[in-house]
A protein has these predicted regions:
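Long, distal/terminal scaffolding or interaction modules
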Residues: 1-143
């Protein structure tokens, strides 16, 4: 599904690399994805009630929303614009949100958050928060 538009997936299970790169204007509901580099450069995408496992999720995406999702894997959601997470859970996620403009409500622990650019992140807890870039102005609230 490279460079596709107007996709509408429901109850789909997918196991494969580089899925949904450069897609636009698409909706995914009740899906289960085991993938690498999914949703890179995606625009105007909504993912609801789904499980996404794999590394480097959704880098360079724009206007992407994850709602009631489980996200698992290293370095997810980096270099994003207008990224939203609504009531999501994260497992085994480290170095998340690097250089992203994000509004996130995460109902779980995050291993590490690295230099989110702007917005706010609410999570139950995090092992480490790395904000060593002076441009990282995101509000991070734990608890």
């Amino acid at each position: 599904m490279l460079r596709s538009a107007d996709l509408n997936f429901k109850n789909v299970t997918l196991n494969g690399k580089y899925s949904f790169q450069y897609i636009e204007n698409s909706v995914f509901e009740n899906c289960n994805f085991a993938t690498k580099d999914a949703f890179w450069h995606a625009k105007n995408v909504i993912v609801r009630n789904s499980v996404i496992k794999g590394e480097y999720l959704a880098w360079y995406c724009e206007n992407v929303t994850f709602e009631n999702c489980l996200i698992s894997g290293t370095q997810p959601l980096c270099y994003c614009k207008n990224l939203k997470l609504i009531n999501c859970r994260m497992e085994n996620t480290d170095l998340a949100f690097e250089k992203s403009q994000v509004e996130a409500t995460v109902d779980s622990h995050i291993i590490s958050i690295k230099n989110p650019l702007s917005g706010s992140i609410r999570a139950l807890s995090a092992d480490s928060i790395i904000q060593d870039d002076p441009q990282s102005c995101c509000e991070i609230r734990l608890g």
